[in-house]
From Swiss-Prot:
Any Pfam family hit: Ribosomal_S7
HAMAP family named among the record's database cross-references: Ribosomal_uS7_B (MF_00480_B)
GO MF term list: rRNA binding; structural constituent of ribosome; tRNA binding
Subunit structure, as described in the record: Part of the 30S ribosomal subunit. Contacts proteins S9 and S11.
GO CC field: small ribosomal subunit
Name this protein carries in UniProt: Small ribosomal subunit protein uS7
Keyword flag rRNA-binding: yes
Keywords: Ribonucleoprotein, Ribosomal protein, RNA-binding, rRNA-binding, tRNA-binding
Family: Belongs to the universal ribosomal protein uS7 family.
GO BP terms in the entry: translation
Function per UniProt: One of the primary rRNA binding proteins, it binds directly to 16S rRNA where it nucleates assembly of the head domain of the 30S subunit. Is located at the subunit interface close to the decoding center, probably blocks exit of the E-site tRNA.
Gene behind this protein: rpsG
Organism encoding this protein: Alkaliphilus oremlandii (strain OhILAs)
């Protein structure tokens, strides 16, 4: 813990094309080795592909996908009397968004298609339809929290 109070959170600037902070965070999540231009091209091309494939507004499809992959509950390890319990806790809104983007990027990279644009577009479309690996991760997280509901009284 810092001695001089808490460190202020840095505000993420909205992306130049869609004016969305969530898209900006997705770009930052996809970025490797500081190559933001490459990451922007991937995200914008993927959103254009989504627009073309679904016929819907890409930003709406992305927001629907994010709502389907952001977790409400998660488990945290809590040590009580020499035993570790998985205690279910609610996820803060900023962490929900961060986890959703992190899972989306990780499962996009793990997909089998050729090219990151194709992978990202398909993963976002799958997530908006409540299918795909990212949605499964959210459901698994919720199942884990549900299974450990008995330890909810250990919350801190």
């Amino acid at each position: 813990m810092p001695r001089k109070g808490s460190v202020p959170k840095r505000e993420v600037l909205p992306d130049p094309i869609y004016g969305s902070k969530v898209i900006s965070k997705l770009i930052n999540g996809i970025m490797l080795d500081g190559k933001k231009g490459v990451a922007q091209k991937i995200v914008y091309d993927a959103l254009a592909l989504i627009n073309e494939r679904t016929g819907e507004d890409a930003l709406e499809v992305f927001e629907k996908a994010m709502n389907n992959i952001m977790p409400v509950l998660e488990v945290k390890a809590r040590r009580v009397g020499g035993a570790n319990y998985q205690v279910p806790v609610e996820v803060r809104s900023d962490r929900r968004q961060t986890l959703g983007i992190r899972w989306l990027v990780n499962y996009t990279r793990a997909r089998g298609e050729k090219g990151m644009v194709e992978k990202l577009a398909k993963e976002i479309i799958d997530a908006s339809n409540s299918t795909g690996a990212t949605v499964k991760k959210k459901e698994d997280t919720h199942k884990m929290a549900e299974a450990n509901k008995a330890f909810a009284h250990y919350r801190w």
